[in-house]
Amino acid sequence: MAGESFEWWRRTMQYQTGLGLTADEKARYEKDYAVYNREKQCKSCYEYRDWMLKYSPTVRFMIQQISKLNGNASDGKVLNFDESKIICDECPDWKSGGFHPEIGILLCQNRLKDKWHLEDTLSHELVHYFDNLKWQIDWLNLKQHACSEIRASALSGECRFSREFARLGFSMNFGRGHQDCAKRRAIISVMGNPNCKDKEHATKVVEEVWDSCFYDTRPFEEIYR
């Protein structure tokens, strides 16, 4: 094991300095590094996921609410959430996660910056999961899609003050930062819907459902994070 670690260190130093590095060695290192990095990201993603399932108040609460919606077992107990429906994998574009009603939740291991970014992303997708069970969302219906995106951004914690300030600094609207963030992110998500024409179309749809969806904090009593 120590020998393997030293050899990897040697190859890394050779790659970074370029000393004695042939074109074949460079290509082989980049290929090996991609595999190494993918495995490392995957391991971290599942470790963070499992930690959040145990210790995150938001994630644990959403799991409980989803389990209730899933129905009861024959003995009257609430069915447990199937954690295998939350998977980690690489994503080719800008998103950090996704939800599919038949498959479950995807966490983009190569897009997640840290454990807390994963918490926000998982919480966001769990809101979609909840909405889909409670209201049988038609994800190609722009208004229904927009409503769930507004709720997911508002309730997940991804638009809380500290996150938004880190993104925008003093250019953020301190009075409406949370609302602006939820609206902005919902518009971006709706733009990805195949039935959406462009940003103007997405903005119009989000505005139409904004009040009824932003202030609907179910299953929370209020915006928690």
Curated annotation (Swiss-Prot):
- Catalytic machinery residues: 125
Question: Which molecular-function annotation in GO is an example for this chain?
Answer: metalloendopeptidase activity
Bilayer disposition of the protein: Peripheral membrane protein
Residues at which a divalent metal cation binds: 124, 128
Broadest EC class assigned to this enzyme: hydrolase
Subcellular location, record wording: Mitochondrion inner membrane
**What biological-process GO terms show up in the record?**
mitochondrial protein processing; mitochondrial proton-transporting ATP synthase complex assembly
Q: What is its main location?
A: mitochondrion
InterPro entries named in the record: Peptidase_M76_ATP23
Pfam families noted in UniProt: Peptidase_M76
User: How is this protein annotated for GO cellular component?
Assistant: mitochondrial inner membrane
| EC numbers, comma separated | 3.4.24.-
What are the protein's UniProt keywords? Hydrolase, Membrane, Metal-binding, Metalloprotease, Mitochondrion, Mitochondrion inner membrane, Protease
Name the family the entry cites: Belongs to the peptidase M76 family.
Q: What does this protein do?
A: Has a dual role in the assembly of mitochondrial ATPase. Acts as a protease that removes N-terminal residues of mitochondrial ATPase CF(0) subunit 6 at the intermembrane space side. Also involved in the correct assembly of the membrane-embedded ATPase CF(0) particle, probably mediating association of subunit 6 with the subunit 9 ring.
This protein is called what?
Mitochondrial inner membrane protease ATP23
Organism the protein comes from = Candida glabrata (strain ATCC 2001 / BCRC 20586 / JCM 3761 / NBRC 0622 / NRRL Y-65 / CBS 138) (Yeast)
